[in-house]
Every structure is written in C-alpha cells, then in structure tokens.
C-alpha cells in the first residue's frame, strides 16, 4: 500500500469532502484498512486523512495537491513530427475514393468487346482500307437471317452485298442523298441500276458467325462500273462468298439508260481499283424460257410495300426469293445454291404482277443441279433472267469457289 501511495499523491487536508456526491470524493487518499465489526462485516473510514508512510516515516506533499482541468488549463503537448501528421483515416478514405474512381474510368476505356466485328468497327458502319479504295464491314449472322438448315439464306448474303455497297459510297463522301448518288448525279436525276450480278458461295455462315465483307469498284466498259465483293469468316479467314456486278446509269424521271457524264466520271474514277474481277464473267447466253419449255411455273407474285427501295422499284434481293419460288421443293430440301447469275432486263414496280418460271438446264455438269430461270410480268415482259447451280448440302469446301484469292492486293 505504501508503494501505491507514491504513484497516487493525496491533496492537502484542507479540502473538504462532500460524501454522497459523485465527482467530489475525499480530498485525501489512503489505503482502506478493514476493521472487524460485531456482525462480521467490514467498517471503512470515510475521511481517512493520515499521511502516507514509507518505511515507517511520514511523507508530506506540497499544499497545492493535484489540480484538475477546472483549476487551470493544461499546457499543449509539445510539437512533434507524429502529432503534426494529418488524420490518417481521412487521408486513407480520400485515397481509396480516388483509386476507385480511376479504376472505374480505366475499365470503361479499356473494356474489350466480345464481338469481333466491334474491335475495329465500334458502330457497325464499316471503314475504308488500302488508301481508301476498299471498304470493309463486319456482320454478325442473326437468328432471323438463317433458314431451315440453320445457315444464312442467300437473301441475307445479297442484303450484305447491298448494304456494304451503299455504305462504301457514303463513307467515300460521294453520297449526296444518302442512298448512292453523287452530287453530280443528283443534279442530273441519275441513279445507279444493276445490270448483271454473279454470286458464288463456297460455304454459308451459321447463326452467331461473324463475317467480313470487303468491296471495291472498278471501270466496266465505257459507261459502266463494276463492283466486287469478298465475304470471309472473321475467325478463320476462309473465303465464303465471291460476288461481282455491273452497274449502269439511268435517268430517274425518264427511266431510260444514260451515259456517264464527265462531271460524274471525275467524281467516281479516283475510287476505281485496277484489278481483275473476283469471278470470271459467265458470258453464256441464257436461252429463251416460256410456258412450253418451263418445268415449273409460279404465278400471281406481287410486290409488297416493304419490297420497294427508295427509287420505288423492287429491291434486287427480292428477285432471288421470287426465282426460288418455282425451284422444285426436293432440290431446296436436299441441295444448296452455290452459284447464281442474274441479268436484269427492266425494273418492277409496285403494281406489277409477276410469274416465276424454272427449267432444268440440260447443259449442266457435275453432281449437282442446274436451272434456268425467268421472272416476267403477266404480259410477258422480262424482268430478270438467271441461271443457278446447286450442290448437295454440307458439301462445304467442295463447292465451286476457287481457293485462290482475286482481290486488289493486300487490303488488310
């Protein structure tokens, strides 16, 4: 007890105590000494004030005793390196907030898209390559673009060809009205119309595949323009489809063919590529086809409003569907279209009623089938003449498309 009193000094005896009130205990402190009482309990002195003793000698304290915070303000702690540092909890919170914000921003900038076509083309509008002469656009095959055999339909392929052709003109800055006409063509009421189309399919993509379409234009004769396409698999680079077409100009008001004016030629010739066609021109003459020579006829075909394009005539891709209407069902079920040649004779309007005629081509060779087609008006006017070649389904790489590439150089 003597040792403890050295660490807990006691105030002077003149300080009065107020028993029973918290905070104002006795002014002096001494170890409690128990005293026996008759009932066996302990008796404690309430105001013991004896000075503490060490080794039998009394130890005195200064009269000032202990001072409380109410008596005098405490001196500020000395200025050291530690107590001048900022509040670490607040600093840590600020650093954490800044780090999380930076991480979120980085993730937004560095996010990697899942679709391959979005890596180079974030908005799906395509881009030009090889000094602006080749246009490239990627497409993902949707569920509504496949047929009963779970592969893309020929109409889907034709739509991709048309879409890239128009986007090419727009990206090159040659589209005045947003649909393929240059400014000089717009002034002269001229439009492009397709005269001939050849398509060769090596393999049809399936649902979920991503295809890359490359297209470019070249000169064709004195008053024509040739447009070629290559469609490949984005993952493997395999060439899926080759297509080539010839376009001529027509006056939108008179509906007559027109020569290419010099002003228009100066607009488009800088974009021409000096290259051979990706498909060798099929110059075989299409024989005459009528009701007597046809093996199958489908009548009463009429265009719907959705079949018309901005020039108020039937979309080119729609003709493919009408031609297939008269193809024998057993061919559609067991074979797939691998080659297509179409020659466009005249346009088809909204009020037209058409007939689709199909006949087996006797000159066909190979293990597949070949057919001749004619799409005509009820009065006999020819709209489209064509030839199709078919192969057994799932023939794949055994198709008619050659393995060598016929593109204008390295357009990567």
From Swiss-Prot:
GO CC terms, sorted: chloroplast
Listed Low complexity bias regions: 1-13, 56-66
Active site per database record: 311, 313, 348
Reactions listed under catalytic activity: tetradecanoyl-[ACP] + H2O = tetradecanoate + holo-[ACP] + H(+); hexadecanoyl-[ACP] + H2O = hexadecanoate + holo-[ACP] + H(+)
Presequence extent in this chain: 1-46
Domain of life: Eukaryota
DNA-binding keyword on record: no
One Pfam family of this chain: Acyl-ACP_TE_C
Alphabetical list of SUPFAM superfamilies matching this protein: Thioesterase/thiol ester dehydrase-isomerase
Primary localisation category: plastid
EC number: 3.1.2.-
The protein's name in its UniProt record: Acyl-[acyl-carrier-protein] hydrolase FATB2, chloroplastic
């Amino acid at each position: 007890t003597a040792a403890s009193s050295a660490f807990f000094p006691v105030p002077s005896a003149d300080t009065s105590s107020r028993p029973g009130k918290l905070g104002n205990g006795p002014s002096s402190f001494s170890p409690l000494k128990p005293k026996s009482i008759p009932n066996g309990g302990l008796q404690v002195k309430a105001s013991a004030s004896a000075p503490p003793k060490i080794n039998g000698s009394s130890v005195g304290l200064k009269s000032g005793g202990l001072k409380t915070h109410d008596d005098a303000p405490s001196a500020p702690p000395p200025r050291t390196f530690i107590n001048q540092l900022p509040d670490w909890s607040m600093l840590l919170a600020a650093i954490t907030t800044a780090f999380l914000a930076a991480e979120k921003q980085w993730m937004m900038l560095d996010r990697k898209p899942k679709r391959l076509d979005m890596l180079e083309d974030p908005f799906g509008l395509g881009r030009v390559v090889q000094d602006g002469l080749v246009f490239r656009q990627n497409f993902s095959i949707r569920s509504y673009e496949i047929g009963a055999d779970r592969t893309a339909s020929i109409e889907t392929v034709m739509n991709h060809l048309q879409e890239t052709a128009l986007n090419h003109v727009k990206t090159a800055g040659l589209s005045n009205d947003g649909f393929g006409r240059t400014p000089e063509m717009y002034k002269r009421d001229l439009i492009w119309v397709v005269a001939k189309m050849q398509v060769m399919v090596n393999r049809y993509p399936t649902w979920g595949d991503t295809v890359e379409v490359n297209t470019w234009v070249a000169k064709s004769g004195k008053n024509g323009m040739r447009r070629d396409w290559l469609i490949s698999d984005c993952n493997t680079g395999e060439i899926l489809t080759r297509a080539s077409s010839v376009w001529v100009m027509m006056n939108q008001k008179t509906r007559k063919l027109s020569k290419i004016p010099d002003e228009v030629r100066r607009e488009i010739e800088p974009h021409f590529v000096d290259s051979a066609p990706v498909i060798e021109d099929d110059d075989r003459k299409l024989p005459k086809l009528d009701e007597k020579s046809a093996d199958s006829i489908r009548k009463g075909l009429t265009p719907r409003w959705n079949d018309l394009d901005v020039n108020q005539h039937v979309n080119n891709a729609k003709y493919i569907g009408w031609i297939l209407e008269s193809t024998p069902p057993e061919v559609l079920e067991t074979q797939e279209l691998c080659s297509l040649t179409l020659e466009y004779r005249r346009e088809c309007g909204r009020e037209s009623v058409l007939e689709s005629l199909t006949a087996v081509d006797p000159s066909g060779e190979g293990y597949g089938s070949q057919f001749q087609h004619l799409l005509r008006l009820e009065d006999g006017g020819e709209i489209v003449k064509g030839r199709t070649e078919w192969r057994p389904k799932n023939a794949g790489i055994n198709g008619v498309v050659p393995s060598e590439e016929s593109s204008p150089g390295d357009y990567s």
